[in-house]
Amino acid sequence: MQQQDSGGAIVNVSSVSGTRPSPGTAAYGAAKAGLDNLTASLAIEWAPKVRVNALDVGLVRTELSHLHYNADVVAKTVPLGRLAEPDEVGNCAVFLASPMASYVTGATLAVHGGGEVPAFLREES
């Protein structure tokens, strides 16, 4: 890391997959779990000059998301009833990088619409 007089803010983009297993995503989930731990560790090591935080992002509607899953079906499993929009994730990153979050470091902000509705509570279509 280059020496500097002032501090900075790092925002890592992680995933709910770091804490929520899913078939076929073991390597991805392990990498994201590692990123979550790296965030917490670097926040301690680099304080007080550098703040390090992460976003744990759930499903996001993108131009390619339809290739991976049916967004309307998946949205029914999210408490807010929809997938995130890219700008909603971006706004969270801007917040963590901004002076408004000047006392936030080592945090992981969940950007997942409330998580996942348990299967036994889902309404049948």
Can you name each region flagged by the protein language model?
Residues 78-89, 100:
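A conserved structural motif in NAD(P)-dependent oxidoreductases
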Residues 15:
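Residue(s) in the substrate-gating loop at a strand-loop-helix junction
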Residues 20-26, 81, 99:
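Active-site loop immediately N-terminal to the catalytic Tyr-X3-Lys motif
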Residues 6, 31:
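Active-site helix of classical SDR
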Residues 3, 43-48, 102:
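Alpha-helical segment proximal to the catalytic Tyr-Lys
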Residues 21-29, 41, 122-123:
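Active-site loop-to-helix junction immediately N-terminal to the catalytic Tyr of the SDR YXXXK motif
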Residues 57-78, 88, 118-125:
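A glycine/serine/threonine-rich, flexible loop-to-helix segment
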Residues 20, 94, 105-125:
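Short C-terminal tail/terminal secondary-structure segment
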